[in-house]
C-alpha cells in the first residue's frame, strides 16, 4: 500500500477537540502515514492565529518592547492542548529556546515557524507518530528560493526508515541551517513535496 500524505491547516488543529477529529481521520486509513501540520489557527471569531501572535513577539522584540505577555498567551494556547489531551510532552525547553532567540538576535522566519514546530510535536505525540523537523528535509537555496532537488533527496533519505511521521509545514532550512519560511499558506507546499 502506497503511503498517503495528509495536511491539516490551522483551524483543523486549533484545539484539543480538533486534534481528536484529525486523529480519527488519520486512523481511518492506515495508508495515511505522513502528516503535515500547521500552527493553531483561530478557535473562534475574534481569536488570533498563533502565527500572528509569533509575529507580534518578533515585532515587540525588534522594537525593544517586552514580548513576554504575547509569548505567555502562546504558551497557554499550547498548554491547553497538552492538558486537554493528557499529553506527556514538555514544551518548556522549546519556549526557553524561543525566549533566548528573542533576546539575542530575533529572526522573523524562525519565530513564525515555531507554531508549526510546536503543534507538530504535539500532534506526533498524540498520534504516536515520530516528529520530524521540516528543517531536516525542506531545503532552500542561499537566495531563499525553494530547492526541490535537495528537498526530494533529503525527504527520501529521512522518511525511508520512518513508518509514520508528523512534519511541520510552512518552513525549512537555508544552506547554513537557518530557518526559512514559505509565504503564508506554505504548509500546503510542504504537504505537496512530502
Regions found by a protein language model. Give the residues of each.
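Nucleotide/pyrophosphate-binding catalytic subdomain
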Residues: 1-194
Amino acid at each position: 500500500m502506497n503511503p498517503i500524505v495528509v495536511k491539516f491547516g490551522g483551524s483543523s488543529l486549533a484545539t484539543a477537540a480538533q486534534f481528536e477529529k484529525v486523529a480519527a481521520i488519520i486512523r481511518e486509513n492506515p495508508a495515511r502515514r505522513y502528516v503535515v501540520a500547521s500552527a493553531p489557527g483561530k478557535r473562534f471569531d475574534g481569536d488570533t492565529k498563533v502565527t500572528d501572535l509569533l509575529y507580534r513577539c518578533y515585532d515587540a522584540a525588534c522594537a525593544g518592547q517586552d514580548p513576554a505577555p504575547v509569548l505567555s498567551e502562546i504558551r497557554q494556547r499550547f498548554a491547553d492542548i497538552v492538558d486537554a489531551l493528557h499529553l506527556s510532552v514538555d514544551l518548556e525547553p522549546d519556549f526557553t529556546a524561543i525566549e533566548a532567540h528573542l533576546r539575542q538576535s530575533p529572526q522573523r522566519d524562525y519565530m513564525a515557524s515555531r507554531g508549526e514546530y510546536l503543534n507538530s510535536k504535539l500532534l506526533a505525540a498524540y498520534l504516536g507518530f515520530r516528529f520530524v523537523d521540516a528543517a531536516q528535509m525542506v531545503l532552500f537555496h542561499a537566495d531563499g528560493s525553494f530547492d526541490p532537488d535537495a528537498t526530494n533527496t533529503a525527504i527520501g533519505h529521512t522518511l525511508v526508515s520512518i513508518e509514520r511521521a508528523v512534519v511541520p509545514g510552512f518552513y525549512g532550512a537555508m544552506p547554513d541551517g537557518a530557518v526559512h519560511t514559505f509565504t503564508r499558506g506554505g504548509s500546503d507546499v510542504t504537504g505537496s513535496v512530502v
